[in-house]
Amino acid sequence: MNNLRNRLSGVNGKNKRVKEKEQKIWSEIGMIAGAFALLDVIIRGIMFEFPFKEWAASLVFLFIIILYYCIRAAASGMLMPRIDTKEELQKRVKQQRIESIAVAFAVVVLTMYDRGIPHTFFAWLKMILLFIVCGGVLFLLRYVIVKLAYRRAVKEEIKKKSSFLFGKRGKRSQFRAAFFIGTLICIHSAKLF
């Protein structure tokens, strides 16, 4: 990806300001391409009701852009704010559960709008199954993202505490310091008994 960016870029220097401008330009190009794909889906797919094959590529392109953005935003921590405590984790999981149920309900309503209201028991069963599967998969995916964000925050907190205690030494010196502290504690506790 960096090779492609360097080939398409006029400036290969390491100036941070130039790189930020270049990233802004690329993001604007991506937004314009996504807007054209969305416009194509709306005009050909919804307004003129052309066959699905004619506007499916635009829909796929739009989903790829959205998926790429979500993955990059989740990986950078931009999509989910920092979760430091268990209470925040529980609150965020509850929020994700409610949002997943709402999205699953919207999918079922849109499906019923497209296909019509079910008239048989098995058709209703399919709608209920669609609701459960869609909500479950979406909640599972969002739960994993929230849990990973919480674990990342906990790991960073542990790193900060350990670097505060032991400084920026290597693993061997950290082991020596921990061994020394443990020895002092053992000697002190032996004196108490």
Swiss-Prot record:
It holds the Pfam family DUF6773. InterPro entries: DUF6773. It comes from the Bacteria. This is Uncharacterized protein YcgB.
